Amino acid sequence: MTRLCQNRLAMAMVLIGVVVPTRAAAQQVEIATSVAFTEGPAVDRDGTVYFTEMVAQRIMKLTAAGVLSTFREHSNNANGLLVDPQGRLIACEGAESQRTGVRQTFKPQITRTDLRTGKMDVLADNYQGKPFVGPNDVTIDAKGRLYFTDLTGGAVYRIDGPRQLARILAAPDIQRPNGIQISPDDKQLYLIEANGAEGGARMIRAYDLHADGTVGNMRVHYNFYPGRSADGMSIDTEGNLYASAGMNQLRGTSETLDTKTGVYVISPQGKLLKFIPIPEDFITNNAFGGPDMKTLYVTAGKTLYKVRTEIAGLPR
């Protein structure tokens, strides 16, 4: 495996009134306002970054020129996003909300939006008549099949087409499935377990991914326990995972501070190759973009960061 060169933490973008210093991650972060919680970045072929802003219920849009705007209001608590090869935005909607004092009802569903026309279609909203609970994150294989997690529902599904749905993993074999990725050769599926309960699974699981879209031969790829597990992840052309994990302050769970906040670069063999510190809790997800696919966009707290990498990423 080619050794990863030193990643450089680039200047953090100033988004939604949050200012982050451009030097070392240890510097104090100045927060001008607190109005956002960023999640689920996805990058279009033209360099536009889409990400969810879960407190205000919006999907945001940042152009390659740095112009920030709202792509969609009332996002139905959208979380994980993906831009498919046809340039359509896939969204995991209706994700669970745990914000104190806020009680809202969302419709759990997977949608697909044409970025040119704005037309939105519902790809799936139930399995065998039972509604989803909290769709969280999504990825895609080379055949165009979508795989998504239902974190609170404890399941992983595959979408072969509109209303063509299969459940490939479920409790008790998995607990709280979060981020999901597929290897460049479509032979491995990676799944983040993010269970903050005492003794809960906090790891990346690896499975053999068969040609028919089913999985088997589960093994622990990387274990974050007893710290905070990863939330979301992306993958590069050499099969290395970039997992957004950890925390720098306790949040009332059994999770410890053993896992520091940052991006964990993990080889196909499950070895930690590099750690990229991110100076803000809570880190959530990341996605590759840029003309050479060597810019990693990272969502954490109220901020969208970007990091240059040596190896190009995949748009998954």
Q: Which residues does each PLM region occupy?
A:
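Sequence-structural signature of mature extracellular/luminal beta-sheet repeat domains
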Residues: 25-316
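Bacterial N-terminal signal peptides
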Residues: 10-20
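Hydrophobic alpha-helical segments, especially transmembrane helices
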Residues: 7-9, 24
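N-terminal secretory signal peptides that target proteins for export/translocation
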Residues: 1-6
